[in-house]
Amino acid sequence: ASQIEEKISTLLENHIRYDNKLIMVFNHLTDDDIHEFINAFIKVYSDSTSFEGTEYTADSCHQVTEDLILYNFKIVREVSERKELTMSDLGNLAEDVLGQYSRIIGYRPVKITCFDALAIDIKNKRLILQLDLGSIVLANAVDKFFQNLRVSINKAFRKLGVTNCRVPEKAQFLNLYTTLQNFYDNEEGEVTKASFSTSKNNHHETLRDRARDIRKAEYHLRGKAAEEALGGKIRPYRISKRFERITNTWPQVYTGVHYRYFNKAISGAKSLYEAHIFDIKSYDDYIFIIDKILVNRTVT
């Protein structure tokens, strides 16, 4: 029984640390940078007032392995909860309303405690910024939440007199835009969901029937052949892909942009800095899926 409890505890701990996160990756830390960040966070976690004036508190620090240090920051975030309303929800209005509509959907604000984080990957010299519960963060709030986390950490550094390190600006993090096409083109792994553009219109596909990879499904292959016959190609602007790390362990990554941005004729390189990682059950899954994201970048 104690072994089972220990396994459950480990799974829960790993879920809180690594799973369902929106991440940004800064890949250019030096040994000096790492040393300075570690010393700065020692000051932050030694002073209970370090995050005063922000929405965050310094929650916990974990030396997960000799290669990874995880700094957690607690914040209470308001999200919208979707609910199908019942007769009891509608009260006296139920009979009239439900007589006109088969389903009534409502949204209400819910406060959720989140544990955002900054991770220092010592071995790979990376700084990883991550938002908790990535699946419930609305797309139009992602930039705002990452900016709030970055600014709050840097404000804590300044408050404590730390002058030699700062969390970088967003534009200094790795641009993941080219992973969109590469996740589709590279054979490794399985594509589980995709939104893509063709010469005629946009399509949104998910796994159905017994398909494990959209790209190998008959319904997708027919459309792909028709597009290629016209001289075009499948161009994804949102994509989810899973990779088998070990037998029956499939960490996943989702990344994408809004179609209007994808299709907009703008000069210069386009940018995408965030990826959503999920089905992460361990530290090894976490490092593995980040490596898969980075290896699928085309550096231009």
Residue ranges and their predicted role:
Residues 1-300:
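Intrinsically disordered, low-complexity, charge-rich terminal extensions
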